[in-house]
Amino acid sequence: AQRSPSLRLRF
């Protein structure tokens, strides 16, 4: 799993 700024909003 990659850490993306977009995913940071969800997680």
From Swiss-Prot:
Q: Which GO terms describe its cellular component?
A: extracellular region
Chief localisation class: secreted
Q: Which terms are listed as keywords in the entry?
A: Amidation, Neuropeptide, Secreted
Which domain of life does the UniProt lineage start with?
Answer: Eukaryota
Q: In which tissues is it expressed?
A: In larvae, both sNPF-1 and sNPF-1(4-11) are expressed in the CNS and ring gland but not the midgut or thoracic perisympathetic organs (tPSO) and abdominal perisympathetic organs (aPSO) (at protein level). In adults, both sNPF-1 and sNPF-1(4-11) are expressed in brain, cardiaca, corpora allata and thoracic-abdominal ganglion (at protein level).
Indicate where this protein resides in the cell.
Secreted
| One of the protein's GO biological processes | neuropeptide signaling pathway
For the modification Phenylalanine amide, the affected residues are F11
Record-stated family: Belongs to the NPY family.
**Name of the protein:** Short neuropeptide F-1
Q: Which organism is it from?
A: Delia radicum
